[in-house]
């Protein structure tokens, strides 16, 4: 693909041969005890959050975690052998009609505030993704009724619970997994694709879905 081709700047993370994964200047080994909400703040702001900052992120996610019923109907209507990645991408696109960025752009939004609408969309989508991913798992693999989100829990514990596992050790494993996969630098297929699609002023629902299409490839 683009191996060795310099095509964009990424300041959120990098992998160094002698140091491993570095996220915002911090070695990943020093972040393994952090919650997803803390990692999100770190990626956005560039520094670790205070307790009040973490609580603010949790409240923001909780306020936008509800997933409309039509999305679950769409997932249930997909073929029984649909690939889970296809279902996740379809679920994200089923939310595109809620895009703040798209609405404000159509209303004549000024260029210098594009980032505000894009951030708002991103937060809303990220808040819903655990419930969408859990629904994909439970529908695709016939695990029974969907388990409603509990906005009072942190993201990793809530996701583990919606998958159907209440074991605290599993929730801790999910938290660690989310931390290790929090950022993909900028030059891999999925992240780069998201950048390219967003550069056409497509909203985050489109750009994230496009990135996942790249991630679904075998390479």
What is each PLM-predicted segment?
Residues 1-219:
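Hydrophobic alpha-helical bundle cores within soluble ligand-binding/oligomerization subdomains
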